[in-house]
Amino acid sequence: MAQAQTQAQAQTRSTESPGTTPPAAKPTPAARLTRPTLTAMVIGSMVGAGVFSLPRHFAEQTGVAGALIAWGIAGAGMLMLALVFRTLALRRPDLDAGVYAYAKAGFGEYLGFFSAFGYWASVCVGNVAYGVLIMSTVGAVWPALGEGDTVVAAALSTVGLWGFFLLIRRGVGEAASINRIVTVAKTVPILVFIVLALCYLDTDVFAANFHGTASTGSLFDQVRGTLPATVFVFLGVEGASVYSRHAQRREDVGRATLLGFLSVLCVFASVTIVSYGIMPMGEIAQLRRPSMAGVLEHAVGTWGGVFVGVGLIISVLGAYLAWTLMAAEVLFVAAQDDDMPRFLRRATADDVPVRALLMTTLLSQAVLVITLFSKDAFTFALGLTSALALIPYLLATAFAVKIAGQRRTRRHSTGDLVVGSLASVYTVFLLVAAGPKFLLLSFIVYAPATVLFMMARREQGRRLFSEGERVVLAVSVAGAGLGVLALTLGWISL
């Protein structure tokens, strides 16, 4: 069924220019996802490993005042991004696979390819971060796992990677149903943490942590230092739009995105702020990951750490499931649109893009091996995940700005333009805040991926690159070369 879409899309490509009239509707896939299920996918994608390490990360960078400002900026910026995905789902319901489809429709096939690959790669690296954190959690009682970066930890994470591959291969609908159940199960421990932390909150400790310490620098530096972590924890806000071709009703995509985002924002901010009332921020900054476990253990005793640890494992497994579903979907649709090689088009009778799923698992496996050579496996995976995802996000927000002025959306153009512009500015700010290290590492990942794009073009008997695409290629290759040079000379490190 999935393969039947290819001919119609290939014919559309020859006549449709970026941002013009939408093509005809595509056949509806077998799985039909309701609004609660789509909302669960958004929440499940965002509530993963990151939230359990927020207390330590924020305490390393800032006090209560800086945290409040950071969440205000992150919340407003990510709200604009969530509204962009909601708007695009309404204005262009013909576009499937969310982030990738928007970049291609707005800026052509090559940048669309980069968006698809970058988003997919960010999910794969993010899944490795999840594995590292699970192993670090269990490492508290099994020292052989260390901080999740030992050979034993990597071996166990490998078993988990391939176990999920087999689960998802059984069917999209079944995996999505499991994700909805897991989303409910993993939210409970986080809410319990917030309630207990409020009960044990010490106002004197909270006041002492309010302005941070001299070592954290100026308030601006404090806030900037926290933002990369907020990018990581909010990755997945586009979850419903990525899986929109499976939605029972297309209008549910935008509603699920907004509802999921607002719910998660409240949870993330609460987890961070209440922790400042339990321990001095210097002690929080020294906690073992997941730092939420250390905070609750300090408040209520040993059982609190165990409780959070169990909650983390459930949470991470659920987020891994949701992210893997989205990653495989993006590769599959890109292959359907002839922007990835044809071998990625294969889907099972249960509508599972099995070869895209296999590629996802293989890349995660490769990154897992690389983390064995990094100084801090979790921080490395977190930073690279965020940097890889920001380019696809920026292209999506730019597309929203582009279509805002088109005649067919004139009635909504002012509001759409404001939202799209604010989301674009916020995304650029995050790219700057990420720093040069992870941007250069991202180029090293992006540039070699062009081989897949060239394979797809050769299969179609087309010229490999247009004039404009050659410019993009030159920039990506130059960035990758600079990144390799920086690694070689020790300017940056893993």
Where are the predicted features?
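Membrane-interface "cap" regions at the ends of multi-pass membrane proteins
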Residues: 1-61, 65-68, 78-86, 94-96, ...
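Helix-loop-helix junctions that connect adjacent transmembrane segments
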Residues: 20-30, 68, 145-152, 181-309
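Loop-to-transmembrane helix boundary motifs in multi-pass membrane proteins
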Residues: 30, 34-35, 154-158, 248-250, ...
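Hydrophobic transmembrane alpha-helices that form the core helical bundles
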Residues: 59, 70, 79-161, 165-169, ...
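Transmembrane helix-loop boundary segments of multi-pass membrane transporters
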Residues: 59-63, 67, 136, 140-153, ...
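TM-loop-TM module centered on a large, flexible mid-protein loop between adjacent transmembrane helices
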Residues: 100-103, 108, 140-144, 226-227, ...
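Membrane-interface loop-to-helix entry segments
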Residues: 152-203, 257-261, 386-391, 415-422, ...
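C-terminal membrane-solvent junction of multi-pass transporters and transport-like membrane proteins
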Residues: 347-348, 393-479
